[in-house]
């Protein structure tokens, strides 16, 4: 038990900052300036508190740490918070990217700045809460609550088709979550509790396992997203403001992968084995199909959005391989993708702020005017295609290695996606960066400024650091991943399940 509620502080501190901004009064320009600074300092302090959690975290233990548990609703539903080696990396990723998003919005958002900053701070609270919640109802409230601020961020501050994109995002994700709510009610009736730790120990009948697995899968597959329920993502990315795209790709998508790790494998192990061939098939289709679609895009954001779907295919493949390397690789891939995809969307935002277009054909030869930008964009592009020495390689390699132990045909097909990712990533870089600076509109384009350098530098450093030294991320999650696998196979053995079901795919 933590001596003080550090997870609650980490979770709700952004909400306190949002309240301060809400109560601001004065002239419009003064309120705008103060709202930006309060949001920035709030996210920086939240990051500092989360780093204290990381510093005090014991990676040698698979138990949940910094646990807070208080009675809440109906005697059985509790306010229960805690982190383990699986959830903590996502908490740190969230708190680390939020100050960057605030800085990225510093000059680009001029309309309703106060409301914009409030939306982002509320969203941070809901995202951190999702990764810390240890009660199913509490998790559901945080998980679903995140829809509202993101819906507003896209719908109010987005592009010309923002209303269509925001409603499509909202309806897709809400539909899947309705099924999850029905599964939660069923699980409560069966187990008599909504405590996640108790539900992990509960042995659900096979019929309930399969039905509940499908219900949770529907929600998490849309959130991740998996093929074929991915079509909301490109529209949402294209219309969202730059910082909205960063959070959408870097954090919100990861809630789906986290859900598979926290619920699908430990609570429904037999169903996870039975449905693993389905997940493998959808993952391979996502990797190959969306990579091919990315090759024909003429909008930079759409290309990166489709590449995100392909990369999440490696994540689901590794998770449901249910091997140590597969799951460790899936977690690392999500953390790496959070950094790299966020950086790519920020890179698009840099040139969009100058030229007000995302059309690939509108650019070319930027290296002649923007050498710093070209260097940073090169690092992120190489990481996106999984080049050794960058963080993108580690996750993909581990997921392929872990899945190969279960099904080598799946790995063979997925490897085609690695080749295709190199094709679309290098094509994008060549079209935008290389060549002569022939377009008159680009003649006066300026390189990265001090604020943009401050945003890009930590992302470049992390992309390279985790590529050559992945130990910090892998060590934090290693014990929890091993415990998850051990409990998973123990549950299969107790239920008479067998991993041989996977080999028949």
Q: Where do the protein language model's features map onto the residues?
A:
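Short phosphate-coordinating micro-motif centered on Lys-Gly-acidic
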Residues: 144
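Cytoplasmic/organellar membrane-interface segments at the starts of transmembrane helices
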Residues: 370-372, 425-505
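Hydrophobic alpha-helical membrane-insertion segments
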Residues: 41-56, 173-182, 383, 419, ...
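N-terminal signal-anchor/start-transfer transmembrane helix
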Residues: 9-27, 218, 225
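Transmembrane helix-loop-helix hairpins at membrane boundaries of multipass inner-membrane proteins
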Residues: 1-8, 21-118, 193-201
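Hydrophobic alpha-helical transmembrane segments
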Residues: 78-94, 206-222, 411-418, 497-505
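Hydrophobic transmembrane alpha-helices and their helix-loop junctions in integral membrane proteins
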Residues: 100-106, 125-137, 148-428
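Alpha-helical transmembrane segments and their helix-start/interface "positive-inside/aromatic belt" motifs
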Residues: 32-44, 164-174, 370-373, 450-458
